Amino acid sequence: MTMSPAVDEAAVRSIAIQAATGAGALMRGSFKSTLQVDATDAHDLKLRLDRTCEESIVGVIRERFAAHGILSEEMGYAPGTDPYVWIVDPLDGTVNFFHGIPFFCTCVSCHAVQQNDGSPGEARLPDGRAVGGAVAAVIYAPVARELFVATPRAGSFLNGARLVLKPLASLSDAIVSLSFGARDGSPSYMSRLLPAMIERAQKVRSLGSTALDIVNVAAGRTGAFVQMGTNLWDFSAAAAILREAGGIVDTTEYAPGRWKIIASNPGLFSEVRRLAGQ
């Protein structure tokens, strides 16, 4: 792959933090209030707040990096003229938010854009170009006021404290989180995986926010997370944070834009991957 021209990493990180915490303040101010629902289906919903938070994030990014592309859950993909793309999930855990469960976050990351060379597992944008490494990645959980930040080769941090994972020896010492989707074969897949995890892990949980599930692994709270049926904006920022903390992230695009993800403590990855059928 060709290398993208240099960008001011400190400025990117600062804007990512500003965008994420600004959206988080909007969430915190609206949490447990009357909410306007824009769309629903049998297993999901969209709030007007999703769009409001997205507009806030995009506005912050555009003010400083107008030539960068943006891929966001609500607005879709807007390519830029510079070889960088921001990947945004304005509100990850919308259903939790709607029901008053304080487990949700906003996700913002900036990545180099590169020509697609067909590498296995390579994430691609709608225009066919590849998503490269993260320049900066931020997850903000507004109720807990937890700010996760990662930049390449500089590490991952939670509220300023460095995250460094120590390998765990056994699943029996760890909580494993699973995300139960309703589409793409996820129910049948999880019905096979769940009994194996219940038997081997200390506990199994399903918490409802892909990004927070992944950074919980980075923080050492859980040992692993497995999901089938997720999107690039759900995991891009969190995956960068986990990798910089010393964790392992394995992704498979099994259908266009649909991903299976394994996020793990380094000491548990082989066993989790085996159980997950990789």
PLM feature segments, named:
Residues M1-L91:
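N-terminal subdomain of lithium-sensitive/metallo-dependent phosphomonoesterases centered on the IMPase/IPPase/PAP
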Residues M1-S14, Q115-A130, Q278:
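Short, low-complexity, intrinsically disordered N-terminal peptides in bacterial proteins
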Residues A16, A20-A23, A137, S156, ...:
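Small-residue (primarily alanine) positions within well-ordered alpha-helices
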Residues A23, M27, D50, I61, ...:
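Residue-level signal for inorganic ion chemistry
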Residues R51, E55, E74, P90-G93, ...:
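Generic detector of well-ordered alpha-helical packing
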Residues T81-F157:
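DPxDG-like acidic metal-binding loop motif
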Residues V164-Q278:
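An extended, acidic
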